[in-house]
Structure formats: structure tokens, C-alpha cells
Amino acid sequence: MTKIGKKIRIERIINRESRNTVIVPMDHGVSMGPIEGLKNLAETVNAVAEGGANAVVLHKGVVGFGHRGYGKDVGLIIHLSASTSLAPDPNEKVLVCTVEEAIKLGADAVSVHVNVGSKTEAYQLRKLGEISKIAGEWGMPLLAMMYPRGDGINQFDEKAVALAARVGAELGADIIKTNFTGDVESFRRVVDGCPVPVVVAGGPKMGSDEDILRMVRMAMDAGARGVAIGRNIFQANNPTKMTRAISMIVHDNADVSEALEFLKS
């Protein structure tokens, strides 16, 4: 029963034809406050849904504000982890929601954030293991946001990223979100070393639209199964068109020039 349940839910957060996904995380309100692009969640969810996003990531308290109730459906991933930028250690992620709560709120998947190499790594790994067990029992897909972060750690280093991704898979995640390592070859080794699908994180707002589209193209060429991009989508001049441009690369194998031409049209 749980196997078919998980299959059904996963198909709500991916494209059934390409088997890839465009996820738009909108969980930044806890860590960063009401930043640009997230002041009106309903408006932003609508914009990315119209652009073809497969799923959004929200915290439990704002699910109602992000529910469309009309038009194209968009998958719901409820984020279970949190920390704020004002904390003594923002890398210390704690659980603020349960799998059962997420199910009651209508989630299609849950996500957990782990900072590998942080001072509280042990706690975060233990909680990831616990959540993967519970999620598995309920047939709930688990997205693990795995980042190498801590004193003296280069969070874009290939070996560090590969380790973080592999840890998430080893502890039971169904999909891994992690940093791009800067080029196709190194990220391909990250993907090849992870036995579950990898989606690339967008990170901080980039300098240009072309920069983000180029990163997406390189990640897909390396074998990524999609993206989980927040600020570079919802803080774009036109979030709907940016979502569509990224979707063209992820689902239709468009090149950067094609996606950029659409974005500028």
C-alpha cells in the first residue's frame, strides 16, 4: 500500500513525461523574513504555477495562503526544518513539523534540511533518519536538502557536495537537493555518486537571467533530474516567464539561447 501511495505522490511533484521536476522553494520566510517575492504568497504561488512549476515548498503555517484552489495544480512539499538568520547558529536546523501534520495539510511530499559539517550535524542526521523511517511508513516522498556547511567548508566543493548528497540517499531520502559545483564534469560525478535523483539548488540571487539558465542547463547535462530554485525564480522580474524558461530546459531539453529568447519575448 505504501509503495503505490509514494508513487502517486511522487507523480504529483514531477513531470510524468520527462520524469524531471521544477520545484520552487518558498520556505525562506522563516530564515529571512518577508523578503521580496514572498510578501504575497498566493500571488507568487499562482505565478510559478502558471509558469509550469511542478511543486512548491512551504512551511506548515502558510499552506492555506499558498493554496490556489483553481487553475493548474501544483504539488505541495511541506518543509519540516527551520532556523532563523538571527540565531546564534543559523546552520542548526530543528524540526518544526511532523510527517503526520504534513499529511493532514495535504502534502504530496516533505522536505528536511541538513547542513553536513555543521556543529549540530549529529542531531540533524539523526532527525533525517527518523523522518525517513516515518515518511516511508506513510508512503510519503522525502526531499532532503543536503548542504556542506560549517567552519572551513567550501559548500561548492565537489567532494563535499558529493558526500552531502550521498549521505541524504544513504539515510533514506527519495530526492536530493544540493549545490551546483560549477561545471558539468564535477556535478556529473556528484550525480553518479548518488543512487537517488538529484535536483540542483538555485542558491542566492544570481547576477543575470542568463547565469541561472546556464547553471540549469549545465546541471541537466550532468544528469540532474531537475531544479529546486527559489529566489532566482520568485525574485525575477517575471516569475511566471522565468519558471517557464527553466521548465523549457528541464522538461523540453531547450538550450540556453532558446530559454533566454523566450524570457525576453
From Swiss-Prot:
Origin species: Archaeoglobus fulgidus (strain ATCC 49558 / DSM 4304 / JCM 9628 / NBRC 100126 / VC-16)
Enzyme nomenclature, EC number: 2.2.1.10
Family membership noted in the UniProt record: Belongs to the DeoC/FbaB aldolase family. ADHS subfamily.
Catalytic residue list: 27 (proton acceptor), 147 (proton donor), 177 (schiff-base intermediate with substrate)
Function, as annotated: Catalyzes a transaldol reaction between 6-deoxy-5-ketofructose 1-phosphate (DKFP) and L-aspartate semialdehyde (ASA) with an elimination of hydroxypyruvaldehyde phosphate to yield 2-amino-3,7-dideoxy-D-threo-hept-6-ulosonate (ADH). Plays a key role in an alternative pathway of the biosynthesis of 3-dehydroquinate (DHQ), which is involved in the canonical pathway for the biosynthesis of aromatic amino acids.
Any single GO BP term: amino acid biosynthetic process
Molecular function GO terms recorded: fructose-bisphosphate aldolase activity; hydro-lyase activity; transketolase or transaldolase activity
Record bears the keyword Amino-acid biosynthesis: yes
Name recorded for this polypeptide: Putative 2-amino-3,7-dideoxy-D-threo-hept-6-ulosonate synthase 2
Binding sites annotated in the UniProt record for 1-deoxy-D-threo-hexo-2,5-diulose 6-phosphate: 27-31, 147-149, 202-203, 230-231
Domain of life according to the entry: Archaea
Reaction equations catalysed: 1-deoxy-D-threo-hexo-2,5-diulose 6-phosphate + L-aspartate 4-semialdehyde = 2,3-dioxopropyl phosphate + 2-amino-2,3,7-trideoxy-D-lyxo-hept-6-ulosonate
S-S bonds: none
InterPro entries: ADH_synthase, Aldolase_TIM, DeoC/FbaB/LacD_aldolase, DeoC/FbaB_aldolase, FbaB-like
Quaternary context: Homodecamer.
Pfam family, one: DeoC
UniProt entry keywords in alphabetical sequence: Amino-acid biosynthesis, Aromatic amino acid biosynthesis, Schiff base, Transferase
Keyword Transferase set for record: yes
SMART domains registered for this protein in UniProt: DeoC (SM01133)
